[in-house]
């Protein structure tokens, strides 16, 4: 059906490694994309990011530390953080357990 995407768990793309972490593109449309990120304990992405658009992060497991515009937010399972993507941002798992989060980006940013 036009205008609908339904993707079963076993049909999703295989996550790729980015900075040693698993990053899986769940979907992409004309105006947004969904990404599943799994972080090993005490790890994160190298450097900071800044690009056009908006981001919404939903922590699914563990704790994830998001630093956005110089302010740090420690998000636990179930917490949501939204921010403009043109604010410098970085992501880190400060805990001793794995963490996972869902990010929705608008417009799509992954290549």
Locate the predicted segments by residue.
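Ligand-binding loop in jelly-roll beta-barrel domains
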Residues: 76, 85-111
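A short beta-loop-beta micro-motif enriched in histidine and acidic residues
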Residues: 27-33, 42-58, 69, 77
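Short acidic-glycine-tyrosine-enriched beta hairpin
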Residues: 69-85
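A short, N-terminal "cap"/entry segment at the start of jelly-roll beta-barrel domains
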Residues: 1-33
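Short aromatic-centered micro-motifs
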Residues: 66
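Short histidine-centered beta-strand/loop micro-motifs
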Residues: 16-17, 24-27, 36-37, 45-51, ...
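A generic "binding-loop/recognition-motif" signal
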Residues: 41, 52, 71, 87, ...
